[in-house]
């Protein structure tokens, strides 16, 4: 059933009578307020300017046609993503996806009761044929953050979301604190496409929550292209910014939870 179908929205509306909608970045109760007033200024400060595109001199893009992220992985954005991952907050992943749809593709949202719903942006599919989320890590979280983030994107762009198009050949290995060379080795051959018909001949929009070095997105892209995808562009809510691409043996500490 469609996430934004009337029956599902009614059920979520009833739930919000007991558990009101909260800000995905600071956990403040929002109810029907579209944007958290406490986080608005910091979110604007964390916007990547002048553009969202990732530079190949700072990230490993592999065979990607490109990659983009609207925020730096700092401050309330970092806290919001970590909260979504580690505090059983699947609803927050959808809210993060709304921000991605708005900032990356210009989708406005309207409030349906106390729930924000993304508007379809005419002509903004930008040639993408489908959306594929980076698959879950294999940990017992019960939900996949990139998949839930992709729900508002699919509605805004009017293209199908294929949540099972990519799978893992093995559980995700620990990446936090590892240098780039080891990260790349960890994800080599880690992804597969169970049903190649979903992506064959298609331009894929790959969705993740954070792009750090780009190793994971590049490994996903390799699997998608091997399955017959025409091209892959990666998008994430946030990225770690480096002044220059880190040395292959330089440890990176950006992903450790700090709560």
Describe the residue ranges of each PLM region.
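Glycine-rich phosphate/pyrophosphate-handling loop used in enzymes and phosphotransfer proteins
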Residues: 1-207, 212-259
């Amino acid at each position: 059933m469609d996430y934004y179908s009337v029956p599902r929205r009614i059920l979520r509306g009833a739930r919000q009578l007991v558990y009101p909608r909260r800000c995905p970045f600071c956990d403040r109760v929002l109810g029907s307020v579209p944007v958290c007033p406490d986080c608005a200024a910091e979110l604007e400060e964390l916007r990547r300017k002048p553009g969202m595109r990732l530079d190949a001199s700072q990230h490993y893009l592999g065979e990607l046609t490109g990659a983009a992220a609207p925020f730096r992985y700092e401050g309330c954005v970092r806290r919001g993503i970590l909260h979504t991952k580690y505090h059983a907050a699947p609803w927050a992943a959808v809210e993060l996806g709304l921000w991605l749809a708005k900032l990356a593709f210009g989708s406005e949202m309207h409030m349906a009761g106390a729930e924000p719903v993304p508007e379809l942006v005419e002509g903004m599919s930008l040639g993408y044929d489908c959306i594929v989320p980076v698959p879950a890590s294999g940990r017992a979280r019960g939900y996949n953050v990139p998949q839930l983030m992709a729900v508002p994107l699919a509605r805004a762009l009017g293209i199908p979301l294929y949540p099972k198009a990519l799978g893992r050949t093995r559980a995700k290995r620990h990446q936090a604190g590892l240098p780039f060379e080891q990260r790349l080795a960890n994800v080599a051959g880690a992804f597969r496409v169970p049903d190649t018909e979903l992506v064959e001949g298609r331009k894929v929009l790959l969705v993740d929550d954070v792009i750090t070095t780009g190793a994971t997105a590049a490994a996903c892209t390799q699997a998608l292209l091997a399955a017959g995808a025409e091209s892959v562009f990666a998008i994430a809510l946030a990225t770690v910014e480096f002044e220059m691409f880190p040395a292959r043996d330089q440890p990176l500490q950006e992903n450790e939870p700090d709560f």
